[in-house]
């Protein structure tokens, strides 16, 4: 009987919330891990409490140490435990999206940041800000454009404009995207604010928010995020914008958004709202549909054409992958262009290795007990210093 009463009570609460918010869609739950901030646990808790004050259609779950708060808390003691619990709660469906700090994504997944530009106060998505979409720069930026489009559409922009920051490879990216568009995948190209126009963007266009989606490589995007979020504070406290955004990738099914260790209360609050909206609008379904449409327009052959002329001819024997094992140890200092070589060097030496991307750059992941040996092998091979 008590279970029935609880069910009835929950139903009436949901109806009351729906009447109050005007939305009869089910509530989503957004998690946030509270360990890892340079400003302390209370910084992220305050951000969550700020987001909860005007939360529309979502609840917030804190993942971290016990604190005095009215919000739900799932207790963990360390960052590693927090990330494991976050993954467990996401995979079980208990939470629908999560905001966290210092999380490693696999190669192929990158995050799309969201900022407010100072020129006109316009919001802009920066694609991308952490992670590596591909080892080859131009291919990565083409994928980044798709990730930005997916995220912007998931936030309610039906036809987001796309600009390409004027970096090495920008023209090749532009050609690839225009070929994709010509094959039937709809892309609306932005126009530079400068007199000569075009979809390749200048610094002026960054400040003015000339594009809904600004395409860049992740390292440049990461710097841009830090400038946009902390130019008023001197750098140690990121107080503006919505954080580094969700990890997007083909077949990636967790909605995980990234904060910097320097992100302050307002950014944490905004990141939670960002995460809620993505979950409410079903970013995973939108991503699946966009990847399907892009592939139908020849994405894979376009990407293969980009790398055809840049791949080194290889006369080396095929390196066999050693048996898989748990890889929790990390080795940093590897250039993104050398990740594949690093992995093969270790495989050849009989050490199972995977590549990934940490918040500070590319990493090679090996078994904890083999980190020292693997690091020496990579150093001897000239891959790390």
Curated annotation (Swiss-Prot):
GO terms, biological process: fatty acid biosynthetic process
Signal peptide span: none
Keywords of this entry: Oxidoreductase
EC number from the UniProt entry: 1.21.4.2, 1.21.4.3, 1.21.4.4
Active site: 359
Keyword Oxidoreductase: yes
Disulfide bonds: none
Catalytic activity reported: acetyl phosphate + [thioredoxin]-disulfide + NH4(+) + H2O = [thioredoxin]-dithiol + glycine + phosphate + H(+); acetyl phosphate + methylamine + [thioredoxin]-disulfide + H2O = sarcosine + [thioredoxin]-dithiol + phosphate + H(+); acetyl phosphate + trimethylamine + [thioredoxin]-disulfide + H2O = glycine betaine + [thioredoxin]-dithiol + phosphate + H(+)
Quaternary organization: Heterooctamer of four alpha and four beta subunits. Component of the glycine, sarcosine and betaine reductase complexes, together with proteins A and B.
Function according to Swiss-Prot or TrEMBL: In the first step of glycine, betaine and sarcosine reductases, the substrate is bound to component PB via a Schiff base intermediate. Then the PB-activated substrate is nucleophilically attacked by the selenol anion of component PA to transform it to a carboxymethylated selenoether and the respective amine. By action of component PC, acetyl phosphate is formed, leaving component PA in its oxidized state. Finally component PA becomes reduced by the thioredoxin system to start a new catalytic cycle of reductive deamination.
Protein name, per record: Glycine/sarcosine/betaine reductase complex component C subunit alpha
Organism: Peptoclostridium acidaminophilum (Eubacterium acidaminophilum)
Lineage, highest ranks first: Bacteria, Bacillati, Bacillota, Clostridia, Peptostreptococcales
């Amino acid at each position: 009987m008590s279970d029935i009463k609880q069910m009835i009570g929950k139903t009436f609460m949901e109806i009351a919330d729906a009447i109050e918010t005007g939305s009869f869609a089910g509530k989503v739950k957004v998690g946030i891990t509270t360990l890892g901030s340079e400003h302390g646990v209370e910084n992220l808790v305050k951000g969550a409490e700020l987001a909860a004050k005007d939360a529309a259609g979502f609840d917030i779950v804190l993942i971290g140490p016990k604190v005095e708060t009215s919000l739900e808390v799932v207790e963990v003691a360390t960052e590693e435990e927090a990330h494991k619990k976050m993954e467990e709660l996401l995979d079980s469906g208990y939470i629908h999206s999560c905001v966290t700090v210092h999380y490693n994504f696999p190669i192929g997944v990158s995050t799309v940041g969201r900022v407010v530009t100072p020129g006109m106060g316009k919001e802009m998505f920066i694609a991308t800000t952490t992670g590596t979409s591909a080892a080859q720069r131009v291919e990565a930026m083409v994928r980044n454009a798709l990730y930005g489009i997916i995220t912007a559409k998931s936030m309610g922009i039906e036809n987001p404009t796309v600009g390409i920051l004027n970096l090495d490879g920008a023209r090749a990216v532009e050609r690839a995207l225009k070929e994709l568009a010509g094959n039937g995948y709809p892309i609306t190209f932005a126009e530079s604010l400068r007199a000569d126009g075009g979809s390749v963007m200048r610094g002026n266009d960054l400040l003015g928010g000339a594009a809904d989606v600004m395409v860049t490589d992740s390292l440049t995007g990461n710097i841009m995020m830090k400038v946009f979020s902390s130019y008023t504070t001197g750098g140690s406290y990121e107080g503006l914008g919505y954080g580094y955004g969700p990890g997007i990738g083909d077949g990636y099914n967790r909605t995980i958004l990234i904060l910097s260790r320097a992100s302050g209360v307002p950014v944490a609050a905004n990141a939670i709202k960002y995460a809620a909206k993505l979950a409410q609008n079903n970013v995973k379904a939108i991503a699946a549909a966009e990847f399907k449409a892009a592939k139908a327009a020849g994405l894979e052959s376009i990407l293969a054409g980009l790398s055809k002329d840049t791949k080194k001819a290889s006369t080396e024997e095929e390196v066999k992958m050693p048996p898989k094992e748990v890889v929790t140890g990390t080795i940093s200092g590897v250039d993104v262009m050398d990740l594949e070589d690093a992995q093969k060097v270790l495989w050849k030496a009989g050490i199972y290795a995977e590549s990934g991307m940490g918040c500070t750059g590319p990493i090679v992941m090996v078994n904890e007990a083999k980190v020292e040996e693997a690091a020496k092998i990579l150093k001897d091979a000239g891959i790390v210093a």
